[in-house]
């Protein structure tokens, strides 16, 4: 399982650990990932995703998973989230017509 957020594509970064004597050694900064179950109101089902805490705040700020996915760039989404976005768009289009 990769250490990458399924909604925002945040992944590990590389940097330095700096000691008191200013000696630098390589280290990895890992994203704060959580396994969460989010509810899709359009589809009427819950979806289990591995997302960063930053993405959780963004989902809440945008008004839910459906609104976040509709605004999100499909290139940043995981295949699972991209498929979910397509399903939501298809369902909204069918409801509109």
UniProtKB/Swiss-Prot annotation:
Coiled coil: none annotated. GO terms for molecular function: structural constituent of ribosome. Keywords: Ribonucleoprotein, Ribosomal protein. The keyword Ribosomal protein applies. One of its GO terms (biological process) is translation. One of its GO terms (cellular component) is cytosolic large ribosomal subunit. This is Large ribosomal subunit protein bL28. It comes from Afipia carboxidovorans (strain ATCC 49405 / DSM 1227 / KCTC 32145 / OM5). The gene is rpmB.
